[in-house]
Structures are given as C-alpha cells and as structure tokens.
Amino acid sequence: MNTNPASVTIPDNPVQVHHRTLDVEGVGVFYREAGAPDAPTVLLLHGFGASSYMFRALIPVLAQRYHVVAPDLPGFGQTDVLPGAGFDYTFDRLAAVIDAFTVAKGLDRYALYVFDYGAPVGWRLAVNNPHKITAIVSQNGNAYEEGLSAGWADMRKAWAEPTAANREALRRFNTLEMTKWQYTEGVNDASLIAPETWQLAHAAIERIGVEVQMDLLLDYGHNIQQYAQLHDYFRRHQPPTLAIWGSKDPFFLPAGAEAFKRDNPQAEVRFLDTGHFAIETHGAEIAAAMLAFLDRSIGS
C-alpha cells in the first residue's frame, strides 16, 4: 500500500482561458486566449476535423509562460461568416482572415503552432510576414511533397480533373465515420481519445455545410504549388523549428517531418508512436517539448 501519495500543487494563480469573438472582414472569428498579454505570443492553428477545442489542455500549460491565442478557422468550430459577407473557402482566404485577425489583435510577433490545415494557413502568414514569426512548431503540419501519403489519391485525382464526379468522390471524407477514423487510426489505445472530439468536429461540419469542406479539399492542391516559395522562406530565414509528428499518421508521413531539415538544418524533429491527432494521445509530451523548445528559442 502506498502511504506516500504524490502531492498535488494547485497554483496560486491558475490560468484562466477566455473565449471571445472578433469581427474581421465579415467573419466572426471565435478564439481562445490565455496568459499575460505582454508575454511572447504563441498562435495555435488547428486543422481539418477540429477547432481550437483541440488545444483545450495545451493552452493552460503554455499560458503559464506565454500569451496564447487559438482562433477557429473560417468553416470550423465557432467561427461564423456574417450574413451577407460572402466567402470563398480557399486557403488564401483563410490565411487572409487569420492575418487580419492577428493585426486586429495587435499580434506583432508570434510563434506558430500548425497542424494539418493550420499548416498551409500558417505557412502563408510566415511567407508574407517573415518578420513576425519568432518560431515554428509543426505537429503533423506538412510542408513537403514527400510528406503526402497514398491517402491523398482521391484528392490528387480531383485536383487534376475537377469534375463533378471527382468532387463528389471526396464527400466520404466528411462523414462521421471518417472523422472518427482520422482520430483513431494509428492510435495504440483508442480509449485515450474522448468521443466528443470527433462528434463536435462533425457537428460543426454539418452545421456549417459539407460543401465548405469539399471546397477546401479541392483547393488543397494549391498549397503544394506554393511549397517552393515556402522552402525559400525556410532557407532564407531559418526560423527555430520543431516538427513533432505522430509517426502513424495515415495522411502525413514521417518523411514530411524529416524534410524540414533539408531547408533548415537546425530544425528539431521528434516522432511520437501515435496517429494524426497526436495531441489527443500525447498531449503531455507535446506540451513539455513545446515549452522546452520555446524557452530555448524565444524565452518568456
């Protein structure tokens, strides 16, 4: 019998996470914010099948030393396009809104955490505003052709031939079953993943509209066309970079993480024995690695 249980220390000033909305270019951008505003900022960008909710455990940890801001991208979570605004769901447009959001928030310099769809949004911010980026953490946020698995075959076909039939073939990626699969595939113990993660994500897809997600899947090919420009940014600016990757991601291969070192030799690469949504199963490891990396790279 253990007579010396580990003690639990409750901080004198526990981190409070604020939930706010900011109107930007006809979009009501919902975001989570925590930490001292005068501390170095970390901007968290989620991906497909998710929202800022995926950072619910990470934010309080980072906010002990950093100012943390996590918006929901247009088309996801609690962010809403205002009536009559009109909106083209492309990655250029998503990035323009998030860029305007950072300006409205007064985020002059920030470290980026990018995941999945958040990566092409974040890459555009970095390429267009290299002076604002203090560091990069990529958690299964792809930037290289070799990082794309065979799971992209249907998308590649639709990019090459954007017919109505090829577009319709992408609809299956937006079902509840597929969303759940993206959370659980490659995970050793699926009981670690709370079911509300994929349920909330799918509810948002249905509320906002499946066609929005179809538009983004079709537009993803344009991100690959911009890789050369992104690699030039990496070579020229050498931002402190940590690629921390679920090694059994069905869409983004480990080779995509290793490739960061080609253009940025000082990039740090780490692998976790899990799938795409590594933060759901290895959140503590990611938080610890991020804090150590950010402390080395930008201080607090």
Name every feature range the model reports, one short phrase each:
Residues G47-A50, D116:
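Active-site glycine-rich loops that stabilize anionic/oxyanionic intermediates
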